[in-house]
Amino acid sequence: MSDINVMALASLDEISADDWDACACPEGMAGAGRPNDPFTTHRFLHALERSGSVGPGTGWHPHHLVARAGREIIAVAPLYAKGHSQGEYIFDFNWADAWQRAGGRYYPKLQCAVPFTPATGRRLLTKPGYENQGQTALLAAMIEISQQNNLSSSHITFCTEDEAQAGTQAGFLHRITQQFHWQNQNYADFDDFLGALSSRKRKTVRKERDTAANFGGDIVALTGDAITPAHWDAFWQFYQDTGARKWGTPYLTRGFFD
């Protein structure tokens, strides 16, 4: 195989959707046991940049990696230089505080992640057949960029187990955190699910569903072109309201939804 070279991009404008998605979501991935992930597609990540949800003034500065074997792109990674720890949903504020109390500068740091999306998935995006070479090259590039730019650290969040193992072999520390996931235990229907709950919880859920079913309006499902700018304007108001509660932050701009 040709030597693998890795370069960093300041924007996804510098790589075509086809080249990126050949690594992020190649055809046949589902059959290969690698499910498609909408959050690592060029379209999603580029929408974050295009809308100003990431980029100048946000603390998320794109530094995406592209690995090539000869002229062929074999791996990519969504990478950002971060000026804070917000929007990651992994909390390292104590690390930052300890680092700075020891006289260091924690920010900026490198973050391999999907912004604002605490959903586990691949982060070291490789073409089928290039998993080992691609992961190794991307991890080495992250370490090299951190060292060359005197950054405090490099992080990969919500990655897969095999990526975590590859990171450990490359010298990364493996940190385990906690999430709560709902698992479908082969429930036949909603009543079957309710039957698995305690009496008190069943009563609460049924009361909430009755309230939703009798709110005095209609619920209509819209997809694709049926969703108009007026719908997105209304959604945006709800998004802002929800994000403002309980110390939340609505990170996405209105333009992201266009």
Residue ranges, per PLM feature:
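Conserved acetyl-CoA-binding loop-helix of GNAT-fold acetyltransferases
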Residues: 106, 131-144
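Short glycine/proline-enriched loop/turn "hinge" motifs that connect secondary-structure elements
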Residues: 106-118
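A short, internal acetyl-CoA/4′-phosphopantetheine-binding micro-motif in the GNAT/acyltransferase core
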Residues: 119-131
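Short, charged/polar micro-motifs that form catalytic or ligand-binding hotspots
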Residues: 10, 114, 132
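Short glycine-enriched loop/turn motifs at secondary-structure junctions
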Residues: 4, 118-119
